[in-house]
Amino acid sequence: MLAPEARGDLIHFTENTRDAMETFFNSYDLAEYSEVNPNKLNRKETDELLGVIRERFKSELVITDEDFVKHLAFALIRAANITTSVKVNYVGAYEYTIGGKKFLVKDAWVFPLIKECMKKFNKPNPVRTFCATFEDAYIVIARSLPKLFLNRTIGKRGIPSGYEFLGADFLTATSVCLNDHEKAIVLQASRAAIDRAVSSSVDGKIVSLFDLGRLS
């Protein structure tokens, strides 16, 4: 138990610093704060990484600077469909067209490239960290292309129709691009492989197909 004088000091501290602390943090520029996050790269790391990957894409895919983000978007979509597990065998490929030019990108090229470029950041799962860093961009893009995620891997996670893109295993459920219902779907999808018996809902809305019949 605190001595009377100690309690007095604590009250004094609280009363004299609360307003000052609120004023300081209410106007604090978040760009001045950074941290080491095992799930994502910080702004400085991201800028450095993008510079390296952009040059590799330009050299090996023969692309333009202005189209780089589009190529990056397709890599994120592919990662969502095959998962970012370290156990994935990169034996497939994906194809798309930009500006009338067709690109065939092999998994065995793009994901090892990402791992190589991520090596200096020493992350346990470099591909997952890479994709999670750009999850906001992925969400915006994937919403526009829902039919690209109709596959067995994502289907097994029991995600409601129209939300299949939320089955990507690199989503953190913290993106400002997600509403509460969508965050619940992401969280439920990540648990599905571990415990499919868990049921959940947000405002009566289905967040997992495994809940069908339980909420009626």
From Swiss-Prot:
One of its GO terms (cellular component) is viral capsid. GO terms for biological process: transport of virus in host, cell to cell. The keyword Lyase does not apply. It is found in: Virion. Transmembrane segments: none annotated. It comes from the Viruses. InterPro entries: Closter_coat. Keywords: Capsid protein, Transport, Viral movement protein, Virion. Component that constitutes the tail found at one end of the virion. Together with Hsp70h and p64, encapsidates the 5'-terminal portion of the viral genome. Movement protein that is involved in local cell-cell movement via plamodesmata. At least five viral proteins, CP, CPm, p6, p64 and Hsp70h are essential for cell-cell movement. This is Minor capsid protein. It comes from Beet yellows virus (isolate Ukraine).
